[in-house]
Amino acid sequence: FAIWRITYNGGLGYILTKQSQTRWIVRFVERRGWLDAKKAPRMHAWIHSFYKTKLGAAYDMTCMPNEFNVWILFRSLVDVILLNDVTAYALFSLSHVQGLGNYGMLLFVVRWCIGLLLLAFNAWVKLDAHRVVKDYAWYWGDCFFLCLQNLKFDGVYEVAPDPMYSIGYIGYYGLSLLTGSYMVFFVSLAAHALQLLFLVAFENPHME
């Protein structure tokens, strides 16, 4: 879990900062000719097949700017990191599940009820935040190209500032309650702190 969390906050934070400032990711792909059938035919063929699978047979990568094509590739990288991050955290938490202990059935039931409520609330926060910002902002599309759209920041954005980074990680504490493990709780605190550091070090400066 630590590896995937650091990959997300440190790795993505670093390359997104460079992309935001110098178009580093796009330039990296262009230098290697991955989108050019003459310069890198095998890689181009694989990417072409990937686009057809992901976006449909009608998608023509030659009709779209490189910035958009590279962003689509980047989104898939983000999905891999996020999926492994969530899976690793879930397995880590499950490996530390505690029983009743010395606290009795009542506290056990209360702990599980609150934990499940926090997980459900976390799911709502993520889903509603995605409804508001769509894929473009969810995957940092503004680091790659500008898209003029009028966003209405309602729903979860009226509950808390930067909800995806603040209350959007309350599920960490829900699982901490479900497991009854201090180890899970302190690891969750550290992971949430890294996410807030990502917000301060990359997100806020980029938006400004």
Residue ranges, per PLM feature:
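Membrane-anchoring alpha-helices and their flanking helix-loop junctions
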Residues: 1-159, 166-208
